[in-house]
Amino acid sequence: MPIHNTSIIHSNSLIEENAIIGKNCKIGPFCYVSSDCVLEDNIELFSHVSIVGKTLIGKNTKVWPFASIGHYPQDLKYKGENTELIIGTYNKIRESVSINPGTKGGGGTTKIGNNC
């Protein structure tokens, strides 16, 4: 499991085997990060955060409780195509936010810029 040795992961969180966790990340209790996710350096996940799918979160981003990131698109035309979610650096994702990957009709990628 490529988790940088400076990162701190709460014992009640689940990080799947191929997930990549950068330097100085803090992952609070009851978080889930699936195998295709990349968290760059200095990411902080507060409790109860779920990150799945082909998702990249840029450095120095904070994610507050109950955020749901990278789950299947809500577009009813989605049929399991390869999609991704890219979140830039220095972002603040607040409580109970849902951010989904793109759909085939929109190019398959959702991108969020920096400092949002």
What are the residue ranges of the model-derived segments?
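Internal nucleotide-binding/catalytic subdomain
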Residues: 99, 105-107
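A structural motif detector for beta-strand N-caps
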Residues: 1, 7, 13, 19, ...
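Short, flexible, glycine-rich and Lys/Arg-enriched loop motifs at helix boundaries
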Residues: 72-82, 105
